[in-house]
């Protein structure tokens, strides 16, 4: 399935009418978020310096019409040069399509790319879901309204996990695994797992993997209720609660500074589990709500420096954030950018 258009300069539009089934638009008719290549001729070289084009890394293709024109100053920003004088239009458009297809493949994440290609193949479905790509809904006025509201592709892409071409979601292989590996790379994680039912279920997966009855959990009062369910109810861990600030308007702030003091934490542990109070790492797991509902964002580096040596694990619940590493002023808040030593 082809998602991107091709932007043509005014002079090129008179020479090229279509490219391998892709929509062609003028360079001044797009914001370049839907474009897979910009095609200009050697008389339009000023467009090479367009910041919108360069910011997305969109390929620039130059059609050579005048061999005497010097384009050396622009070569480092040009993806491909096509000698139109010595090529047919069909060969030219084939070269353009190769460039667009490569760019499209580079920007689409693995699973979405595979899913859209699979949908584009228009395979017949003999498994679930039973609406058959949305066609079943067309048998009733209510269903037709439902179908028309969401549009065709959402139903055609509603596929059974038995469609093995897309990979197995349960044993992590194929395109499903490729997507997880891609997400890990993007987020600077060692591994990434996709979990259904949102962060509530993801939290329970982590907590049930790490905690057993009697383990000490250092518990942020701002934690989501799924932390209570997974850590306290299901796993049976013993909580050490950390106090949080609260203003006269009821807004909940961050954990109070003294709660990160080692002697204070060991004192609280002694009250619940005296035999663990003097252990090197008395805390099995600390759970910190990295970004709170009220807008408090913790600096992960500071948290780890304060209590990391007391804990086997620190779990940052990032349900309200997660994008801090991509925002320069918030990078220091990201747990996934930390350089960690043996302690």
Describe the role of every protein-language-model region:
Residues 35-39:
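Active-site beta3 strand of CheY-like receiver
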Residues 89, 104, 108, 112, ...:
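Generic structural signal for well-ordered, non-membrane alpha-helical segments
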Residues 152-202:
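Conserved N-terminal alpha-helix of the aminotransferase class I/II PLP-enzyme fold
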């Amino acid at each position: 399935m082809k998602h991107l258009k091709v932007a043509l300069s005014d002079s090129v539009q008179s020479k090229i009418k279509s490219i391998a089934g892709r929509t062609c638009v003028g360079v001044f008719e797009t914001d370049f978020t839907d474009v897979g290549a910009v095609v200009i001729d050697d008389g339009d070289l000023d467009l090479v310096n367009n910041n919108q084009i360069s910011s997305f890394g969109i390929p620039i293709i130059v059609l050579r019409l005048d061999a005497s024109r010097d384009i050396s100053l622009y070569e480092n920003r040009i993806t491909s040069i096509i000698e139109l004088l010595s090529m047919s239009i069909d060969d030219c458009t084939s070269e353009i399509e190769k460039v667009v297809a490569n760019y499209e493949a580079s920007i689409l994440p693995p699973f979405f790319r595979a899913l859209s290609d699979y949908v584009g193949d228009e395979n017949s479905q003999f498994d679930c879901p039973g609406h058959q790509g949305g066609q079943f809904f067309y048998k009733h006025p209510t269903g037709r309204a439902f179908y028309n509201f969401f549009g065709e592709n959402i139903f055609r892409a509603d596929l059974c996990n038995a469609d093995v071409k897309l990979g197995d979601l349960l044993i992590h292989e194929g395109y499903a695994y490729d997507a997880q590996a891609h997400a890990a790379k993007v987020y600077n994680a060692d591994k990434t797992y996709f979990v259904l039912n949102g962060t509530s279920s993801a939290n329970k997966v982590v907590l049930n993997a790490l905690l057993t009855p009697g383990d000490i959990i250092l518990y942020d009062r701002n934690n989501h209720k799924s932390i209570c369910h997974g850590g306290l109810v299901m796993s049976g861990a013993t909580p050490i609660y950390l106090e949080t600030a609260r203003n006269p308007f009821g807004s909940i702030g961050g954990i109070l500074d003294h709660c990160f003091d080692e002697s204070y934490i060991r004192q609280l542990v002694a009250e619940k589990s005296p035999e663990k109070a003097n252990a090197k790492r008395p805390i099995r797991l600390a759970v910190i709500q990295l970004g709170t509902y009220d807008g408090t964002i913790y600096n992960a580096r500071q948290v780890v420096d304060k209590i990391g040596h007391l804990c086997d694990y620190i779990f940052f619940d990032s349900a309200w954030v997660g994008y801090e590493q991509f925002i320069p002023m918030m990078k220091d808040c990201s747990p996934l950018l930390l350089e960690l030593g043996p302690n």
